[in-house]
């Protein structure tokens, strides 16, 4: 009887958060978050989209649990009402692993302590939407970690992912009115992927969360750590990243999601026992356009005329947006319009500003998008 050929699973995940054990580097950020968890210091974690923020949070939750801290991750993506936020909070507690905190949570539910929210997938008895009813339920939900801490004596870490949505719902005052009383029993990570909205929440003196959390910015991955990660996984599956590795690293320039996408495609084009060379790289590069086209074209089409000019100029390495090159080559207007557009693009997470004052440098968050822009919005390899 012929033996079945074993089909290997591609080791590079690009379309969802990485499992905690597969996180790429982030040792410095993990150390900061672990220290703040020990010291009960709240954190506002901000990063552009696709920089691995959720993967980092999942690893932080896993590490906290291993250290004896009760920890939950609340996903607020797509939440539009107080009732929906309450449902997501209860859903996070439903995912608690077996242990004292889980037992305390089950006890609350058995003795009428359930908040009674209908989550998107079902699971409780009463549907709550917008308005005062939703806010009353949310108040109870927000107090859950402290109630569990009182029952168990165990400290609790709560990580809110996509926390910027509370700004749209104008719920930041309500949230702070509850959690400010939790003392040293509970601490929080407020994570968001819209830099401008996160700044509005935590840096605007008029907002309730002003000064309530220590900042932590998530940047690109170090080249050496990323190279080691890719090489290790190629070797573990009987392949060699070869000279294509350098081309990949040059292209993605530390962008976490783009690195995983191109590594995934390069691995697919590399036969077992083979080295990834030019043919494999060209195949991976060609395939990538099918994954990126919709995102790139939608991003470009969303820009105003001035914003498009700013993106064009910055992608080409121009920093003086109102200088001769900005005006004559990229059609940027005189005055403050170009700088205001750049500020908006930084807030939206399309541009990032490094340094300050005269030394400040603008660059595109996504280096692969930048290459596409420089190529005249064509998908082509550049020399």
Summary of predicted features, one role per range:
Residues 2-10, 290-383:
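C-terminal leucine-rich, beta-strand-based interaction scaffolds used for sensing/assembly
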Residues 150-152, 156-157, 165-170, 177-206:
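Sensor-1/coupling segment of RecA-like P-loop NTPase cores
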């Amino acid at each position: 009887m012929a033996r079945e050929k074993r089909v290997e699973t591609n080791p590079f995940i690009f379309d969802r958060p990485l499992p905690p054990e597969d996180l790429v580097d982030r040792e410095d950020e993990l150390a900061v978050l672990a220290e703040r968890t020990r010291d009960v210091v709240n954190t506002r974690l901000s990063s552009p989209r696709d920089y691995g923020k959720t993967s980092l949070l999942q690893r932080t939750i896993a590490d906290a649990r291993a250290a004896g801290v009760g920890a939950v991750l609340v996903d607020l993506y797509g939440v539009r009402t107080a009732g929906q936020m309450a449902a997501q909070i209860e859903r996070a507690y439903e995912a608690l692993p077996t242990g004292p905190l889980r037992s305390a949570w089950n006890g609350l539910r058995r003795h009428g302590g359930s908040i009674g929210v209908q989550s998107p997938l079902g699971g409780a008895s009463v549907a709550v939407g917008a308005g005062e009813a939703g806010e009353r339920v949310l108040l109870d939900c927000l107090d859950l970690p402290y109630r569990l801490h009182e029952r168990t004596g165990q400290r609790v870490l709560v990580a809110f992912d996509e926390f910027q949505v509370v700004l749209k719902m104008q719920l930041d005052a309500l949230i702070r009115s509850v959690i400010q009383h939790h003392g040293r029993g509970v601490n929080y990570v407020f994570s968001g992927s819209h830099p401008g909205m996160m700044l509005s929440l935590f840096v605007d003196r008029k907002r309730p969360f002003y000064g309530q959390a220590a900042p932590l910015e998530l940047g690109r991955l170090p080249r050496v750590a990323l190279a080691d990660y890719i090489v290790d996984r190629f070797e573990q599956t009987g392949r060699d990243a070869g000279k294509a590795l350098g081309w990949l690293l040059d292209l993605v320039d530390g962008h976490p999601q783009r690195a995983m996408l191109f590594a995934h495609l390069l691995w697919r084009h590399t036969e077992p026992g083979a080295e990834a060379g030019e043919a494999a790289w060209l195949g991976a590069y060609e395939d990538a356009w099918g994954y990126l086209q919709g995102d790139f074209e939608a991003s470009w089409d969303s820009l105003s005329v001035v914003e498009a000019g700013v993106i064009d100029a910055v992608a080409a390495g121009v920093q003086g947006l109102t200088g001769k090159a900005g005006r004559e080559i990229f059609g940027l207007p005189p005055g403050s319009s170009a700088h205001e557009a750049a500020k908006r693009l930084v807030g939206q997470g399309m541009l990032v500003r490094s340094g300050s004052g005269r030394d400040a440098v603008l660059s595109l968050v996504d280096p692969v998008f930048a290459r596409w822009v420089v190529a005249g919005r064509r998908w082509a390899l550049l020399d």
